[in-house]
Amino acid sequence: MNLFAYGKPDNQKWIIVDVGVTFADDTVPGVDIIYPDPGFIIDKKDDLLGIVLTHAHEDHIGAIAHVWPKLKCKIYATPFTSVLIIEKFKEKKIDITGYLKIVELNSTINLDPFKIEFVTLTHSILEPNGLRIQTPAGNILHTGDWKCDPDPLIGGNINSERLKEIGNEGVLAMICDSTNVFSAGRAGSELDVRKNLLKVFERLKKRIIVTSFASNVARMETVFYCAEQTGRHISLVGRSMHRIFKAARQCGYLKNVIDPIDSRDAKNISREKIVYLCTGSQGEPMGAMNRIVKYTHPDVYIERNDAVVFSSKIIPGNEKKLYKLHNNLVKEGIEVISEDNEYIHVSGHPNREDLRDMYNWIKPKAVIPVHGEHRHMIEHIEFAKEMQVKYPVQVENGDIVKLYPGEKPEVYDKAPSGRVYLDGNVPVEEDSRSIKERRNISSNGFLEATIMITPKGNIHNKPLVTFRGLPVYENDEFIYGLEEEIERTIKTFSLNNTKQQDNLIDALKITCRKFSKEKTGKKPLTNINLSLIHISEPTRRYAISYAVFC
């Protein structure tokens, strides 16, 4: 995820570059997305000139509809990115009329004291831009995500001539992609992927299901091309695949490909004449690919001797679920084709030779590596030294770097930084109660006891015990034993005041968790409902209830 801020200290004017998300893993159950805490820039929103977006990947625009309402500033983006963020705001019923400014490719916007030039690069999505940010202190090149693709197939080529000119004009600092800094050679071209995918399509004789990143429109066009060349129809499966296709056509791309057919109609086409292009290349539980493999998709069926083509890489952290998906397919007699056995995917980020080209074009005085893990940043620092950059600067989240001509760049301050976790539609911190409780429940289960007692400490009826997620095989035995422990604990208390009642609740909580630990090895999240009842006559009761979570 990305959120960068550039500011001029003397007049306190700021711009933001990108507002992205990352996707949560199993360590934060119930949370889907995480985005950078924008608190630092919210405090400066009166001096914020705008948000500038480099391209439309989720780690660069995914948080825009969550963060923008707190800022209410102008947004600057090229046409394809603009179409996708308009949809994001529509989904949340947020009106940005008058705020979104569509920027033409290779053009410049003036946000005094900044002048920002959009420079076309190549990446794994349409309209990726590097930003040449002119400031009174000097020029900065913010690369965004990029690579050097000599044949991107769709969209413009990397504007290397303009990059060379920018380098000759002088660049104070380059903020540069580090993702593939460990990879030798070049990242590869979409044209090479097309050639190899066509060979795969020509070899296969049954139903073909291709899964790829929906945002890679060049890859999408390649699958359309291969389908047409081999006499097959194509059907798009998955919401994001349809969304990207629609956005691309709206912006003038994909005009020459065959029209896709509805997946409901595709069921009537013979196996050897249909290709499905679907979402779920990372094994996402609700992705189309996962549903197809589990035979729960309403329209797409897969059977023995069909082929599934994974035209994508495995994102770190997804290995286990993807290998499980691959194995399930193989068990069903389905051929699995991936970058492990065919050259059918290339990265969208620069390998070392691509980086070398950029360094030679830009000739920056300083380099700030970004976009990658800590180990990538360190390796990129070493690469910058190898390229004779005078000032490689290592940064961490929240670092404020001072850039000024003639001076060594330095981290001179720290901005408050952190992560915001979207829990449902509520932004929370990682240590929020809801996340802590959910983690506890996922590991240890949940137990609840409801008890009615008189002021003298007599239990009215038996305690009502319920639990979820505990490895209990003899329910009656477990519940009976816990009831006895609850009764034993209650007998040690007299309930003359509220404090004693609260103390009893705490004691019951300990009793329940201790008993569960002894019997199951688990200390569940425990809820005690304690009702103090006053019985004045057989048919009339008044109760006060207390509930505590722990």
Regions found by a protein language model. Name each.
Residues 1-52, 57-269, 287-301, 320-322:
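His/Asp/Glu-rich metal-coordinating catalytic cores
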Residues 55-60, 123, 142, 344-352, ...:
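Histidine-centered active-site/metal-ligand motif
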Residues 501-532:
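C-terminal tails and terminal domains of large nucleic-acid-associated
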Residues 533-550:
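Single conserved hydrophobic/aromatic residue that forms the stacking wall/gate
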Residues 100-102, 173-175, 308, 336, ...:
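Conserved beta-strand scaffold positions in the cores of enzyme catalytic domains, especially
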Residues 182-311, 315-317, 321-340, 344, ...:
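Hard-cation-handling environments
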Residues 64-67, 85, 380, 384, ...:
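Hydrophobic packing residues within well-ordered alpha-helices of enzyme cores
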Residues 89, 384, 516:
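Conserved hydrophobic residues forming the short capping helix/wall of the S-adenosyl-L-methionine
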